[in-house]
From Swiss-Prot:
Protein name (Swiss-Prot/TrEMBL): Ribose-5-phosphate isomerase A
Organism listed in the record: Nitrosomonas europaea (strain ATCC 19718 / CIP 103999 / KCTC 2705 / NBRC 14298)
GO MF, any single term: ribose-5-phosphate isomerase activity
Binding locations of substrate: T28, G29, S30, T31, D81, G82, A83, D84, K94, G95, G96, G97, K121
Coiled coil: none
InterPro entries assigned to the protein according to its UniProt record, in alphabetical order: NagB/RpiA_transferase-like, Ribose5P_isomerase_typA_subgr, Ribose5P_isomerase_type_A
Entry keyword Cell membrane: no
Function: Catalyzes the reversible conversion of ribose-5-phosphate to ribulose 5-phosphate.
Length: 219
């Protein structure tokens, strides 16, 4: 299968994790978009969705799926989203699309995190993909200096503003051997909203597209 075919296959496979009569959380990105397109075929089975970005909310609305504010719902049964990188320990780098903070919030509320990805996203060690860090604008230079002390090379994603009105620093040249530790350390820097490491709240299930079909991986 091509990469696009793998993405479509995992998007379809994720439908089996959608509970009837519930509200679900949905991520942001190309694979999440394909999942939304598949979800539209069974939209009558769910009560609605909580979106992790304005882009996702708009796509859901285009399909006639009700979008709910997270503050109006309680715990979500499932959150379905892609990843920029993922290990077999279910640790991820996310946020290539800049929606990492809202993705992390919605994932935290969900009982189960289903990651959908093609096989190119599976890695042994995180860090080849630049790690996004969402930062309060006035703290950009300070945070960049602090990240440099941690061994990273931050690059300002110029011209991009998050849905929360903040900026993104993409951190290059990290060899992330301890994702939980680094996630915590980065989040302790004053001015950092959050970073794209999803290690403290890792995925529960990975649906990975391969040449042979969809492989289900759990820890």
């Amino acid at each position: 299968m091509t990469q696009d075919e793998q993405k479509r296959a995992v998007a379809q496979a994720a439908l089996q994790y959608v509970p009837t009569g519930e509200i679900i959380g949905i991520g942001t990105g190309s694979t999440a978009n394909l999942f939304i397109d598949e979800l539209a075929k069974i939209k009558h089975r769910i009560e609605g969705a909580v979106a992790s970005s304005e882009v996702t909310a708009n796509r859901l609305k285009q399909h006639g799926i009700e979008v709910l504010d997270l503050n109006s719902v309680g715990e979500l049964p499932v959150y379905i989203d892609g990843a920029d990188e993922i290990t077999r320990n279910m640790h991820m780098i996310k946020g290539g699309g800049g929606a990492l903070t809202r993705e992390k919030i919605v994932a935290a509320v969900a009982r189960k995190f289903i990651c959908i990805a093609d096989q190119s996203k599976l890695v042994k060690v995180l860090g080849k993909f630049p790690l996004p860090v969402e930062v309060i604008p006035m703290a950009r230079s300070y945070v960049a200096r602090e990240i440099t002390l941690l061994g990273g090379q931050p690059a300002w994603r110029q011209g991009f503003t998050t849905d929360n009105g903040n900026i993104i620093l993409d951190v290059h040249n990290l060899n992330i051997m301890n994702p939980v530790e680094l996630e915590t350390a980065l989040n302790q820097i004053a001015g950092v909203v959050t970073n794209g490491l999803f290690a403290r709240r890792a995925a529960n299930v990975l649906l990975m597209g391969t040449d042979q079909g969809v492989e289900t991986i759990t820890v």
